[in-house]
């Protein structure tokens, strides 16, 4: 169900955004989303620009699921593979009964496929699954793509990149400072260069406000990058 949030819309408008891509952020195969114009003075009939903006996926099980499976990343990948195989079987007319979920998946196969990942390795895993089934995902990254830029480039995927940078560590207390790993320090230092590294390596990307606690920090972080 879609409900227009006037307050959030005004925040995005003030940050320079006129359109948003939205969907139900729950589950592995999440269905299609909506492309919405941020017009607080119009009705939804005019705001909704596209009722099938893309198909959305992730490796995260639905919060509403009552099943224990999948309980691991490997299990989520296996379930996604099996669903694709079932959808292909269903499309060939091999099932006696109609499966509405598989029908919907097949109907959405020509849409842009946007895969949300939580880290660099998940981005590579998602691309691997897509390659098995001839699907080129657009990947929602995590901002650490610079760590394995050669592997990221080899995916040939378009990326949607957040710019939610880590805060500087408080090292005023020497006991706490000792607990900060060198890896974390390096990541804090280098992650603002992620966009530069992607650009220099010819990786196509767009930016997202996703994961920002406040949309107001978008331009500040962009200037930092």
What residue spans do the PLM features occupy?
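Extracytoplasmic and endomembrane cell-envelope/extracellular-matrix remodeling and assembly machinery
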Residues: 85, 95, 103, 124, ...
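Short, charged, surface-exposed secondary-structure boundary motifs
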Residues: 31, 148-151, 168-175
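His/Asp/Glu-enriched, well-ordered alpha-helical/loop segment
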Residues: 1, 112, 158-225
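Generic beta-strand/beta-sheet core signal
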Residues: 23, 116-118, 140-142, 160-164, ...
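Glycine-enriched alpha-helix->loop->beta-strand junction motifs that scaffold or abut catalytic
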Residues: 130-136, 153-160, 202-204
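Short acidic loop-to-helix transition motifs that present clustered carboxylates
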Residues: 120-122, 143-147
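Polyanionic/metal-chelating signatures
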Residues: 5-138
């Amino acid at each position: 169900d879609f409900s227009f949030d006037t307050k959030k819309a005004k925040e995005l408008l003030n940050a320079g955004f006129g359109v948003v891509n939205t969907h139900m952020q729950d589950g592995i195969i999440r269905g299609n989303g909506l492309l919405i114009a941020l017009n607080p003075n119009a009705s939804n009939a005019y705001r909704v620009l596209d009722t099938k903006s893309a198909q959305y996926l992730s490796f995260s099980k639905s919060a509403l699921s009552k099943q224990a499976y999948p309980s691991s990343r490997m299990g989520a990948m296996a379930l996604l593979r099996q669903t694709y195989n079932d959808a292909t079987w269903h499309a060939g007319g091999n099932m006696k009964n109609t499966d509405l979920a598989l029908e919907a998946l097949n109907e959405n196969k020509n849409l842009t496929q946007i895969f949300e990942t939580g880290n660099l390795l998940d981005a590579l895993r998602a691309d691997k699954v897509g390659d098995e089934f001839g699907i080129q995902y657009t990947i929602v990254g995590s901002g650490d793509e610079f760590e394995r830029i050669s592997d990221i480039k080899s995916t040939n995927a378009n990326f949607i990149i957040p710019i939610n940078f880590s805060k500087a560590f408080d090292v005023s207390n020497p006991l706490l400072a000792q607990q900060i790993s060198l890896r974390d320090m390096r990541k804090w230092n280098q992650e603002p260069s992620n966009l530069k590294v992607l650009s220099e390596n010819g990786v196509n990307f767009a930016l997202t406000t996703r994961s920002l606690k406040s949309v107001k920090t978008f331009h500040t972080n962009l200037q930092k990058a």
